[in-house]
């Protein structure tokens, strides 16, 4: 199963994904009465914007983390939102099929993108829209470099795909009108936020299972090897329709 997250800390940090999610949401052509899946809803900040775009519709808020889903429920309540804890690597318990799928900052946590896109296609009606953004090729290069300096085996645990490979996988899964592209989003962090941000957002899969002291030492070492308190994000953008 996917790892759980520190949802409360995640919610407090100055994450840029909410603003990026608003942009991705704008790619969906919505009447307001659709049923839309938020695949990787996190704490529900983007889900809330999505629900507000659907005054006569509803949202399926899905995440692999129990604490994230609980935080989303606390934010949104049960008004036109269905909550699911599920693994995007497996067939999804979503029925009937949805009219559209939105996803932000999720796909790069999943190794098997062929299975991911097949599972999404299976719960999306024919003609339904997919709008997504995740980490793409070259994402967080300064962090990956720092990890490699500590131990080469620490690099490459996330799955930052190229636009070309992603387009091919989407088409193989039954998507058409596929558009994929990269753009850079360098994100400076306020003083004092770098290490909490790294621990919660970027290095959570590395520090899972460590003691608090080990976590702090590891995160500090990574941070000390970065040239500046800036996360060098590269985003992979995805737009497509189900055939």
Task: Name each region found by the language model.
Residues 15-32:
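Conserved alpha-helix/loop element of class I SAM-dependent methyltransferases that forms part
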Residues 37-39, 43-91:
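Class I SAM-dependent methyltransferase SAM/SAH-binding core
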Residues 93-101:
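A short acidic, Gly/Pro-enriched loop at the edge of an enzyme's catalytic core
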Residues 100-113:
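A short SAM/SAH-binding and catalytic strip from SAM-dependent methyltransferases
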Residues 110-111, 124-126:
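Helix-to-beta-strand junctions that scaffold the AdoMet/dcAdoMet cofactor pocket
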Residues 114-115, 129-190, 208-211:
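Conserved catalytic/acceptor-binding region of the Class I
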Residues 173, 178-229:
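C-terminal helical/coil "lid" or tail adjacent to the Rossmann-like core of SAM-dependent
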Residues 236-243:
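Core SAM-dependent methyltransferase catalytic element
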């Amino acid at each position: 199963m996917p790892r759980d997250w520190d949802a409360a800390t995640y919610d407090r940090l100055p994450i840029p994904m909410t603003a990026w999610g608003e942009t991705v949401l704008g790619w969906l052509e919505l009447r307001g009465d659709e049923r839309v899946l938020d695949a990787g809803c996190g704490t529900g900040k983007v889900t809330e914007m999505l629900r507000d775009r659907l005054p006569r519709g509803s949202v399926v808020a899905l995440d692999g983390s129990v604490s994230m889903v609980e935080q989303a429920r606390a934010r949104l309540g049960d008004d036109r939102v269905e909550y699911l804890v599920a693994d995007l690597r497996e067939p999804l318990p979503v029925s009937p099929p949805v009219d559209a799928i939105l996803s932000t900052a999720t796909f790069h946590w999943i190794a098997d993108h062929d299975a991911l896109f097949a599972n999404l296609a299976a719960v999306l009606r024919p003609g339904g829209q997919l709008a997504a953004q995740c980490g793409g090729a070259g994402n967080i290069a300064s962090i990956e470099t720092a990890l490699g300096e500590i131990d080469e085996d620490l690099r490459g645990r996330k799955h930052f795909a190229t636009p070309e490979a992603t387009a091919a996988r989407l088409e193989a899964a039954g998507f058409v009108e596929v558009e994929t592209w990269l753009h850079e989003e360098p994100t400076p962090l306020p003083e004092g936020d770098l290490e909490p941000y790294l621990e919660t957002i970027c290095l959570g899969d590395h520090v899972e299972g460590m003691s608090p002291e080990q976590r702090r030492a590891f995160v500090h070492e990574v941070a000390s090897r970065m040239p500046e308190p800036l996360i060098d994000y590269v985003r992979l953008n995805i737009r497509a329709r189900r055939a």
